[in-house]
A protein has these predicted regions:
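Mature soluble binding/inhibitory domains
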Residues: 1-92, 96-143
Length: 143
């Protein structure tokens, strides 16, 4: 699963300032290598207006089902700390994808469980993402 581009962060997503909206840039790769227990890759997620820059290279799992891909892991926020993340995407070009690439990012403090960012705050982790990616962005899922 790979992707890159941008989206508009909706109101309520950035818990430190719920009224803040704006452009978020993202890039990610995640895949299993032969005989590997955990997937490998990198996830970058930056919300400039929120002064938030998240980077992860540690992954717990990757699950692909049709046009949907979800992976979970942990990384650092603004270069420090320990934060879990859950990234769920839909490849709009695949059967069942609906013609639009969609994206959900949830980031929370590993120690306290406090949510830092979730562009579908309050939704189940199993829900399909609803936020469309911006023009020129791309999400590609390959098995």
């Amino acid at each position: 699963t790979i992707g890159g581009g941008w989206l508009t962060s909706p109101p309520g997503a950035y818990l430190a300032n719920p009224s803040l909206t704006g452009k978020v840039s993202f890039g990610f790769t995640s895949r299993y290598f032969k005989n590997a227990t955990n997937p490998k890759g990198e996830t970058q997620f930056s919300f400039i207006l929120g002064d938030m820059d998240f980077n992860a290279v540690n992954f717990d799992y990757l699950v692909i089902s049709g046009a949907k891909s979800q992976f979970k892991g942990f990384g650092k926020l603004n270069g420090s700390g320990a934060y879990n993340f859950l990234l769920t995407v839909i490849d709009g070009d695949l059967p069942g994808g609906g013609g639009v690439d969609r994206f959900r990012m949830k980031i929370w403090n590993k120690a306290t469980g406090a949510i830092v960012y979730d562009n579908q705050f309050g939704a189940s982790d199993a829900d399909d993402p609803t936020t469309p990616v911006g023009s020129g962005s791309a999400i590609t899922i390959q098995k």
